[in-house]
Amino acid sequence: MGVFNFEDETTSIVAPARLYKALVTDSDNLIPKVIDAIQSIEIVEGNGGAGTIKKLTFVEGGETKYDLHKVDLVDDVNFAYNYSIVGGGGLPDTVEKISFESKLSAGPDGGSTAKLTVKYFTKGDAAPSEEEIKGGKARGDGLFKALEGYVLANPDY
């Protein structure tokens, strides 16, 4: 099995606590409201903490598909959240799982700095393609910006 790491960092004008609430605490309800392609997020097993399995149902190319996410860490105090895609349509044939480690911290002017590490655990020596990496980054950036936009548009959130 190969492991390929990618890191990304971005900033937001939204404070870490408000952004974490949208990205993690309320995400199961908020994401389907904000992202048209995502129909639902439901807990299949667990209570929302580490070890929980979530099913994310989405529409892609006119087809309904799903991903299974396993929650690896929920740290509400330090604004950290880790999960892995462990099944469903979001995994390329050459990948066993994709893990995401995210952390929000105080950024400039009362905003946030978001750090993300993505690990592809591949079958054999296969490496993720540049297309897979770029596609995953684009989806992640889109989700982040959509939830950030929701928080900015709803000051009482």
Curated annotation (Swiss-Prot):
Q: Which domain of life is it from?
A: Eukaryota
Gene Ontology terms for molecular function? abscisic acid binding; protein phosphatase inhibitor activity; signaling receptor activity
Pfam families attached to this UniProt entry:
Bet_v_1
Expression induction: Upon contact with the plant pathogen Pseudomonas syringae pv pisi and salicylic acid.
Q: Which organs or tissues contain this protein?
A: High levels in roots and not detectable in hypocotyls, cotyledons, stems, leaves and flower buds of untreated plants. After induction, high levels are present in the vascular bundles of leaves.
Q: Which Gene3D superfamilies match?
A: 3.30.530.20
Q: Which UniProt keywords apply?
A: Cytoplasm, Pathogenesis-related protein, Plant defense
Q: Which residues form a coiled coil?
A: none
Biological process (GO), any one: defense response
Q: Name one GO cellular component term.
A: nucleus
The entry's localization annotation reads: Cytoplasm
**Similarity-based family:** Belongs to the BetVI family.
- PANTHER family attached to this UniProt entry: OS08G0374000 PROTEIN-RELATED, STRESS-INDUCED PROTEIN SAM22
**What name goes with this protein?**
Class-10 pathogenesis-related protein 1
- Protein source organism: Medicago sativa (Alfalfa)
Gene behind this protein:
MSPR10-1
